């Protein structure tokens, strides 16, 4: 019986990255031997055990054989005669197929260390195509390690494309697809996840609403990058720089879905695209089982980003309507999320990545002013029921009008 540290812990140690989880592989052992040592079994589909003291996972070395469709269509053999090399052969990427024994010696039968040195994401074997989930995993690794210079090997991208064309991606559950998207959104470069999925033809299958944006032109005057798909990638990249919140990053990703619906006769203009995109966002979120928190912010950003861009020109009444629609009185955190997503949209344009976005501060300040109106004096003045709400609205419009006047006067000075 031999124990090996495997997978992400070995990879991240070689990359000099923080190690989050440690997974171990056990060669030459049967479940009965693990029980005798005090380990508790937790895996149903294949033997995974928890260490009696550390609670870390120890999996018996195993091989896998494709028996059906999807990422669950496998049977496995975890007998004691499965070798280290056989177990590592079933793994997705060479950088994840390195093992380390208890003396620190590395075992790298498939060239993972060389690929780490050359910054390459490469499949271990042609069995890669048997698991459609690997398309999403590799795209996520590409996003996660992009800042280190990693790219996907051409031959691996070819196998990912083969999976996309096979129809196997349809076997993935909505929950699993969103889980991979959510993990990718939390990386430094989530736009790479979308880019890689597009390169291997998976984007049009998993997220057709996003794929439809590529090739849709925008006015060059406002969008030097022209292509709406490219703009979307740039906005997502900016959102990742401006916010750690995945909900903000998701809103940035889907804020322009309506541009794919613009009539060809009106291109490259996209009148009302924020509103026309709302139905597409709802469809995408329902299909992918996106959390309500993400969906609601995405709908708000799509609906209002044009207004925020032009906020200086809006009437005070319109500003209050935006605050009402966003429910900022009860959910003030949304203000920062909305401002950040709109700033990402503005900066997600070729050559304008470092341009200022004063609209965000104007939005913050105008809401702060409107939110300073107290309801107590209104009640004390004798107003009741619906009258209170109406008076509150009028007072807010009045004070925002004064703020707008003072702001404009100071701008002239």
From Swiss-Prot:
Binding positions (CTP): 8, 11, 91, 137, 140
Protein's UniProt name: Multifunctional CCA protein
Subunit structure: Monomer. Can also form homodimers and oligomers.
Gene3D superfamilies linked to this entry: Beta Polymerase, domain 2 (3.30.460.10), cca-adding enzyme, domain 2 (1.10.3090.10)
Keywords carried by this UniProt record: ATP-binding, Hydrolase, Magnesium, Metal-binding, Multifunctional enzyme, Nickel, Nucleotide-binding, Nucleotidyltransferase, RNA repair, RNA-binding, Transferase, tRNA processing
Function, as annotated: Catalyzes the addition and repair of the essential 3'-terminal CCA sequence in tRNAs without using a nucleic acid template. Adds these three nucleotides in the order of C, C, and A to the tRNA nucleotide-73, using CTP and ATP as substrates and producing inorganic pyrophosphate. tRNA 3'-terminal CCA addition is required both for tRNA processing and repair. Also involved in tRNA surveillance by mediating tandem CCA addition to generate a CCACCA at the 3' terminus of unstable tRNAs. While stable tRNAs receive only 3'-terminal CCA, unstable tRNAs are marked with CCACCA and rapidly degraded.
Amino-acid positions noted as binding ATP in the UniProt annotation, renumbered to this chain: 8, 11, 91, 137, 140
Domain notes: Comprises two domains: an N-terminal domain containing the nucleotidyltransferase activity and a C-terminal HD domain associated with both phosphodiesterase and phosphatase activities.
MF terms in GO: ATP binding; CCA tRNA nucleotidyltransferase activity; cyclic-nucleotide phosphodiesterase activity; magnesium ion binding; phosphatase activity; tRNA binding
Domain of life: Bacteria
UniProt source species: Shewanella woodyi (strain ATCC 51908 / MS32)
GO biological process, one term: tRNA 3'-terminal CCA addition
PANTHER family associated with the record: MULTIFUNCTIONAL CCA PROTEIN
Catalytic activity reported: a tRNA precursor + 2 CTP + ATP = a tRNA with a 3' CCA end + 3 diphosphate; a tRNA with a 3' CCA end + 2 CTP + ATP = a tRNA with a 3' CCACCA end + 3 diphosphate
Additional record remark: A single active site specifically recognizes both ATP and CTP and is responsible for their addition.
Domain HD: 228-329
Its EC number(s): 2.7.7.72, 3.1.3.-, 3.1.4.-
Chain segments annotated as transmembrane: none
Co-factor binding details: Magnesium is required for nucleotidyltransferase activity.
Family assignment from sequence similarity: Belongs to the tRNA nucleotidyltransferase/poly(A) polymerase family. Bacterial CCA-adding enzyme type 1 subfamily.
CDD domains from the UniProt entry: HDc, NT_ClassII-CCAase
Cofactor(s) recorded in Swiss-Prot or TrEMBL: Mg(2+); Ni(2+)
Binding site residues for Mg(2+): 21, 23
């Amino acid at each position: 019986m031999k124990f090996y540290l495997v997978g992400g812990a070995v990879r991240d140690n070689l990359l000099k990255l923080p190690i989050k989880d440690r997974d171990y592989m056990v060669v030459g052992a049967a479940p009965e031997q693990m029980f005798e040592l005090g380990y508790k079994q937790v895996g149903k589909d294949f033997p995974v055990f928890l260490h009696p003291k550390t609670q870390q996972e120890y999996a018996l070395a195993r091989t896998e054989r494709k028996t059906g469709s999807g990422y669950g269509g496998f049977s496995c053999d975890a007998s004691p005669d499965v070798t280290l090399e056989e177990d590592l052969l079933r793994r997705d990427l060479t950088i994840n197929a390195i093992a380390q024994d208890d003396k620190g010696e590395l075992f790298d039968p498939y060239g993972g260390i060389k690929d780490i040195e050359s910054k390459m994401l490469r499949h271990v074997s042609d069995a890669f195509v048997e698991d459609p989930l690997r398309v999403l995993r590799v795209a996520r690794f590409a996003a996660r390690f992009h800042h280190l210079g990693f790219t996907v090997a051409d031959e691996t991208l070819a196998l990912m494309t083969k999976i996309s064309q096979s129809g196997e991606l349809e076997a993935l559950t909505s929950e699993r697809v969103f889980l991979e998207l959510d993990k990718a959104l939390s990386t430094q470069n989530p736009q790479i996840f979308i880019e890689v999925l597009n390169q291997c033809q998976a984007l049009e299958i998993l997220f057709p609403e996003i794929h439809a944006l590529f090739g849709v032109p925008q006015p060059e005057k406002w969008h030097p990058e022209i292509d709406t798909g490219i703009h979307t990638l740039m906005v997502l990249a900016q959102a990742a720089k401006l916010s750690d919140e995945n909900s903000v990053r998701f809103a940035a990703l889907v804020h322009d879905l309506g541009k794919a619906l613009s009539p060809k006769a009106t291109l490259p203009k996209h009148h009302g695209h924020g509103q026309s995109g709302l139905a597409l966002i709802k469809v995408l979120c329902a299909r992918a089982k996106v959390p309500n928190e993400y969906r609601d912010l995405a709908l708000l950003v799509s609906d209002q980003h044009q207004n925020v861009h032009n906020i200086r020109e809006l009437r005070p009444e319109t500003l209050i309507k935006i605050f009402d629609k966003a429910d900022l009185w009860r959910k003030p955190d949304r203000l920062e999320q909305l401002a950040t997503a709109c700033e990402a949209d503005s900066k997600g344009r070729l050559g304008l990545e470092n341009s200022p976005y004063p609209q965000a501060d104007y939005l913050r300040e105008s809401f702060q002013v409107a939110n300073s109106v107290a309801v107590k004096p209104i009640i004390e003045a004798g107003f009741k029921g619906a009258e209170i709400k109406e008076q509150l609205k009028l007072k807010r419009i009045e004070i925002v009008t004064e703020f707008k006047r003072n702001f404009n006067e100071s701008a002239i000075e």
